[in-house]
Amino acid sequence: MGDIYFVRHAESDIRVHDEFLRPLTEKGLRDSALITNYLKDKDISYIYSSPYIRAVDTVKELADELNISITSIDHFKERRISSWIDDFDSFSKRQWNDFDYSLADGECLKEVQIRNVTALMELVQSHPEANCVIGSHGTALSTIINHFNPHFGFESFSKIKALMPWIVKITFEHHNFIKMESIDIFKNNEITPINLEKSELVNK
């Protein structure tokens, strides 16, 4: 049995509109230590990340602590948007209501989901018994959750929109999905099962 710990990046500086280069804020850098404290004793063998700076920097302290190099995987990057969006909530709701909707030169959620889930399952095939960490993003990670639990939609996404950093643990056995759990490091590492019958995150 292997556990995949997805780590949604810590708070980033939204004054920087470049998706690739946007850094963590000072608070984000401090909060990354909470990720390290939680994961450093989880027998982690591999650390992967989206190539975006904010995702890499969120797991960098953990990688240094465990002396594990971070492998960047392009497929784990955040949804591509053609330009900066001021009314993110309206745009996000429209995308969650229609997985095929996108702006010109942007990605729809179906595309984001396919590339993220494909990359995830390739890692599961490569390391079936290993515990791995993956530096990720809010929307990208949420589409992965939706793949395994279709009840996770816009309402659930809205609940975690401001939760940065955030850990989602996905357990596999013999390449088969077993369960998902949400870990809130700001609430004494509170663990909430993400059930297949419903999204518990909606009802909290």
Model-predicted regions and their roles:
Residues G2-I70, K110, M164:
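Active-site-proximal alpha-helix that buttresses catalytic centers in soluble enzyme cores
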Residues H151-K179:
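Domain-level recognition of soluble alpha/beta enzyme cores
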Residues S12, A140-L141:
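Short active-site segment of divalent metal-dependent hydrolases/proteases
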Residues S49-S50, I114, G135-S136:
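Short beta-strand scaffold positions
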Residues I4, P128-T139:
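Generic beta-sheet signal
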Residues I44-H75, N146-N149, T171-K204:
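Conserved histidine-centered catalytic loops in small-molecule metabolism enzymes
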Residues D41-D43, L123-A130:
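Glycine-rich phosphate-binding loop signature in dinucleotide/nucleotide-binding domains
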Residues D64-T118:
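Phosphate-handling substructures
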